[in-house]
């Protein structure tokens, strides 16, 4: 939950309603099937599924829903430095697509979900545009600060 909370925070920041729960592809398979197969009916637009180790959850969720699924590989205590999770989510068979973000990158999963939703919701699209503008300004401020401390002799 510590990793996945970053996605929830992004969605809240963008004003997107969300549903946060815990399901397991291995320990609660019927709960996972019920959750994923009813998600569109409940009004969800995108599912973000985080998993560690064998990381079957995102793929299994994608197999029973028509919604876009974003997989977040999570480095767990028994993982192979997270590579098992990354590869499990990346290597999906044709017909069961899962968008995959970097290891523990739930924030990017939230941003990707917001961009998907923003393609059909002008309010969310505006918030995403502002988010990107804010990031641009932050980088420009850092560059200006560095340049003032370390002037570049090759600038024109």
Residue ranges and their predicted role:
Residues 1-2, 6-7, 81-156:
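C-terminal binding/interaction regions
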Residues 10-14, 59-68, 92, 118-119:
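Alpha-helix C-terminal capping segments
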Residues 35-74:
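Glycine-rich phosphate-binding loop
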Residues 3, 27, 31, 53, ...:
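Short secondary-structure boundary/capping elements
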Residues 1-30:
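Glycine-rich phosphate/diphosphate-binding loop of Rossmann-like nucleotide-binding domains
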């Amino acid at each position: 939950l510590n990793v996945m909370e970053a996605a929830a925070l992004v969605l809240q920041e963008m004003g997107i309603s969300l549903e946060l729960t815990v399901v397991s592809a291995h320990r609660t398979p019927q709960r996972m099937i019920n959750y994923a197969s009813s998600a569109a009916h409940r009004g969800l637009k995108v599912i973000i599924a985080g998993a560690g180790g064998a990381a079957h959850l995102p793929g299994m969720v994608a197999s029973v829903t028509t919604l876009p699924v974003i997989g977040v590989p999570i480095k767990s205590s028994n993982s192979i430095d997270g590579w098992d999770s990354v590869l499990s989510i990346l290597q999906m068979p044709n017909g069961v697509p899962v968008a995959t973000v970097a290891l523990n990158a739930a924030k990017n999963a939230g941003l990707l979900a917001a961009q998907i939703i923003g393609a059909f919701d002008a309010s969310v699209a505006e918030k995403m545009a502002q988010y990107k503008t804010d990031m641009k300004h932050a980088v420009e401020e850092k560059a200006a600060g560095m340049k003032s401390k370390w002037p570049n002799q090759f600038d024109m």
